[in-house]
Amino acid sequence: MIFKEVELTDKILSELIDCSEAWEQENSCHGYRKNTEEDIKGNRIFLALENEQMVGYLFGFMDKGERKNSIYEKDEPFFEVEELYVKPELRSKGIGKQLFGYMEEKLKEEKVELILLSTATKNYKAILHFYLDELGMEFWSARLFKRI
């Protein structure tokens, strides 16, 4: 398995959109829709490759806190993870964890000290286990809804 950060090319864009379309079809996240070029452009892209084929991706962007809150100071830089995806047949094999770890090491080299992400999965117990127990993230907040 190879992990690397890549520039957006037409081929990579097409593969990312194909993966996100498959993810949309899984119906595993509330409100998830497949990505468009506009959703992906401008993000940093990290890939998991097996035999030169994309099997997972992570993309996100650098941002700064608009105002101080309980997690970061005003203007403190952080990396916001937009999406982390591994093909269904390869899940639970540590690929997502390794991909996240690769991205984290790259950010540490750049002196980035904070990573944020939100998730809209329907299987919150599994995803909290993954992010909290497997990746060592901390729980910040929860946004809940009830359709009536």
Predicted features and spans:
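Active-site rim helix/loop that mediates acceptor-substrate recognition in acyltransferases
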Residues: E24-L49
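Conserved beta-strand in the GNAT
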Residues: L47, Q53-M62, E80, Y85
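A conserved beta-strand-loop-helix scaffold within acyl/acetyltransferase catalytic domains
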Residues: E50, L58-D75
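Conserved acetyl-CoA binding element of GNAT-fold acetyltransferases
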Residues: Y72-P88, A142
